[in-house]
């Protein structure tokens, strides 16, 4: 079984810093150059629309040199997870996230991808 690759962050913003600023180098080191596109799962976000959340996260990942796609825009979300180079889950409401993962059928494909060694980045609820 491949080694699991997890980067788990407690938060997305440190006092006096910008979004994911404190984790930029860790994310770049973790993903490396082999990953060009990450799949973002915005389902923990409840204070704003998924589109607004994606715009914020996409801007930061593009600054780091990565393309970002969002699972909420995919016609076949489980297939998108199965094909992803890396999975990124943002923070927010843990209960909303878990319910959404169950209802969209993403929990099992995500679990399998993590077991397969696909990089997983999550902060807060993610």
Predicted regions and their residues:
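N-terminal beta1-alpha1 cap of cysteine-dependent amidohydrolase-like domains
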Residues: 1-90
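Residues that form generic nucleotide/phosphate-binding pockets
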Residues: 26, 30, 100, 113
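Short, catalytically relevant binding-site loops at active-site mouths
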Residues: 46, 94-95, 126
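Catalytic nucleophile loop
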Residues: 88-91, 114-126
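Glycine/threonine-rich flexible loop motifs
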Residues: 94-104
